[in-house]
């Protein structure tokens, strides 16, 4: 039985006072962090994971591999609170969990450094590091991951301080629960095992303890039973529900992600080590990196076991993330950032101690001996570190005006014909799915985002089964068409704003060319000419996009490369309201054999963003080679405007007439020019 020593009354009061001060500092950290996170929070559903996770949480569904059951069960009740829309609720809870994680990390850093001021500064520095801050701006699993990771480290430290087995048992259960949120938790297990062994030795690992820990771990990780249970009701978004043991295994092991592991040879991890260094500088700045290194060295000398524990977490994180090739790999650096901020805490504590000793030697006639005067000036200067983090990263992570994913989804929903098939990658499918499964908009649309869509044999199978021909209309999202070479070679793709309309059976090429003289109204460089612009036929209904037709022709200097037409909407003061691009693809039929003298018609649709006020606006077009940042010169720019933009039309936006989730949608009432 564990021995329990009752503290004296005086000691108990001191403990209460310390705990009360910690509670106040934790509250301040939550408040400061949350205010910063709400300032930059995205106002709506985002691309990819964000929309998918919101949709799944609202319906108690299954996310992409491995499913994230812990996150779903926590977020579901909050997604049902009738405040704002569903996206706001889940985004807010993500930000709130981020703020709670910062408070938990303060307790970790205060314990490691032995200094509250140092713990406060280190936690606030982590709070406004770019990667973590960015994860608080929209629905994501990583703020909860940091919460659980910080709690796990606190339990390790509590076990060390008390020696009570209950912390080990509770930690075993929590690790299982944490794995139900993200697999990054597994990287902590070797460090925890080392620390327990270093503290207690081999004799601590008795059969009884191991059995209890294993049972509690199994209880925690049994949260994955959520996946097959919920799959029985097939909840939205319907992309990941496992209905068999094979599908369950595939969901847990993420075969698509495994293909990106250890796939680049032995040189890439070495190159990634340099990338880690650059990211650390970007996250914490030179001052934060210097303090982190200084603190890491001090911790190694003072507490070797704890230092190795944190180092093992960092090393396993670096080794794992350096061998994983995904576009958002930077979020996998968060365990390293947690460890680095611990070094910052130790470094800040050491600086404060040195300054305090120096100030103690100053005569009391010059400086008051109170702690405020001994440590206050140095603490205020070191507080510049999180302040610089905030100011440097604010613009990088600010998503408060980011409506791009919602505008895209509403544009697709408004232009797609009834019963259409939408083929896209997960990043574009998810926001359309939010409209369908949460707002109930366009429930007739069929969306397909399976991995086999990228495989040529998969497309051939669909074609053999007349899969594509069975739908009244098919749309492809632009990014995906760059990868689907076979589709571009076999089908006819017509650009329509943010998507391509797919015609499985190509019409004759001569039928696709406009029978008008190829005399350009405006030239973009010596490569592409715009012959004319026409308003598309048909009335514009409130809330729907307005359409126009552009007629393009190649010029003498045309080099056979793909070009992008970029459309920009500006107000009368020249402020940009909206922008999107469209591919004039040379390898898209019928432009694959485009020749001088031929004119091709392109239909384009624009969906106005909600914040557009009634008034007059100018619509410009500019052209650039695909993949280039510089645009081609325009030979007929508007007076007083830059030399790359051609004025397509001036449009009159009237009073809003249709309702969206956030309010009324602006409507184009007239084309003033041309």
Segments predicted by a language model, with ranges:
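Transmembrane alpha-helical segments
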Residues: 375-401
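Membrane-interface transmembrane helices that cradle and orient dolichyl/undecaprenyl
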Residues: 110-116, 136, 152-168, 175-177, ...
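C-terminal luminal/periplasmic domains and tails of membrane-associated envelope-modifying transferases
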Residues: 16, 410-433, 439-674
């Amino acid at each position: 039985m564990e021995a329990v020593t009752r503290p004296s009354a005086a000691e108990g009061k001191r403990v209460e006072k310390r705990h009360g001060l910690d509670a106040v500092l934790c509250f301040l950290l939550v408040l400061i962090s949350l205010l910063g996170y709400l300032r930059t929070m995205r106002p709506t559903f985002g691309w990819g994971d964000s929309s998918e996770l919101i949709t799944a949480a609202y319906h108690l569904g299954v996310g992409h591999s491995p499913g994230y059951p812990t996150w779903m069960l926590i977020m579901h009740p909050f997604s049902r609170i009738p405040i704002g829309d569903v996206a706001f609720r889940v985004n807010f809870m993500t930000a709130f969990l981020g703020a709670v994680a910062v408070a938990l990390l303060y307790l970790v850093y205060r314990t490691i450094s032995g200094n509250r001021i140092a713990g406060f500064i280190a936690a606030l520095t982590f709070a406004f590091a770019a990667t973590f801050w960015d994860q608080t701006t929209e629905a994501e699993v990583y703020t909860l991951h940091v919460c659980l990771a910080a709690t796990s480290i606190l339990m390790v430290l509590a076990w060390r301080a008390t020696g009570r087995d209950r912390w080990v048992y509770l930690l075993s259960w929590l690790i299982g629960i944490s794995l139900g949120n993200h697999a990054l938790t597994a990287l902590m297990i070797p460090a925890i095992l080392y620390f327990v062994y270093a503290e207690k030795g081999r004799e601590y690992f008795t059969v009884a303890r191991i059995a209890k820990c294993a049972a509690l771990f199994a209880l925690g990780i049994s949260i994955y039973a959520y996946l097959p249970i919920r799959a029985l009701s097939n909840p939205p978004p319907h992309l990941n529900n496992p209905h068999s043991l094979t599908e369950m295994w595939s969901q847990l092991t993420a075969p698509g992600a495994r293909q990106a592991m250890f796939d680049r040879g032995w040189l890439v991890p070495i190159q990634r080590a340099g990338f880690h260094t650059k990211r650390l500088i970007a996250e914490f700045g030179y001052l934060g990196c210097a303090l982190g290194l200084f603190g890491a060295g001090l911790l190694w000398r003072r507490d070797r076991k704890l230092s190795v524990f944190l180092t093992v977490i960092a090393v396993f994180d670096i080794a794992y993330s350096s061998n994983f090739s995904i576009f958002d790999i930077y979020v996998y650096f968060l365990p390293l950032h947690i460890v680095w901020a611990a070094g910052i805490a130790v470094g800040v504590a050491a600086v404060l101690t040195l300054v305090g000793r120096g100030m103690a030697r100053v005569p009391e006639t010059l400086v008051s001996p109170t702690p405020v005067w001994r440590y206050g000036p140095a603490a205020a200067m070191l507080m510049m570190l999180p302040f610089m983090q905030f100011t440097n990263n604010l613009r990088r992570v600010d998503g408060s005006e980011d409506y791009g994913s919602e505008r895209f989804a509403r544009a697709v929903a408004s232009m797609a014909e009834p019963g259409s098939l939408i083929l896209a990658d997960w990043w574009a499918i998810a926001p359309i799915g939010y409209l369908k499964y949460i707002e109930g908009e366009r429930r007739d649309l069929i969306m397909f985002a399976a991995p086999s869509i990228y495989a040529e044999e998969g497309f051939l199978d669909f074609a053999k089964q007349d899969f594509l021909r069975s739908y009244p209309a098919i749309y492809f999202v632009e990014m995906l068409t760059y990868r689907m070479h076979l589709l571009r070679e076999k089908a006819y793709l017509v650009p329509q704003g943010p998507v391509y309309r797919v015609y499985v059976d190509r019409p004759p090429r001569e039928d696709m060319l406009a029978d008008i003289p190829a005399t350009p109204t405006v030239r973009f460089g010596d490569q592409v000419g715009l012959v004319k612009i026409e308003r598309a036929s048909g009335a514009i209904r409130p809330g729907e996009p307005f359409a126009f037709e552009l007629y393009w022709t190649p010029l003498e200097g045309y080099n056979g490369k793909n070009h992008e037409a970029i459309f920009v909407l500006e107000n009368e003061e020249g402020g940009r309201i909206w922008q999107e691009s469209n591919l004039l693809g040379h390898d898209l039929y019928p432009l694959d054999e485009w020749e001088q003298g031929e004119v091709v018609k392109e239909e384009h649709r624009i969906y106005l963003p909600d914040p557009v006020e009634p008034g007059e606006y100018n619509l410009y077009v500019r052209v650039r080679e695909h993949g280039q940042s510089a645009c081609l010169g325009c030979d007929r720019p508007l007076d007083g405007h830059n030399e790359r933009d051609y004025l397509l039309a001036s449009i009159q936006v009237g009073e809003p007439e249709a309702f969206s989730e956030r309010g009324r949608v602006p409507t184009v009432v007239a084309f003033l020019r041309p």
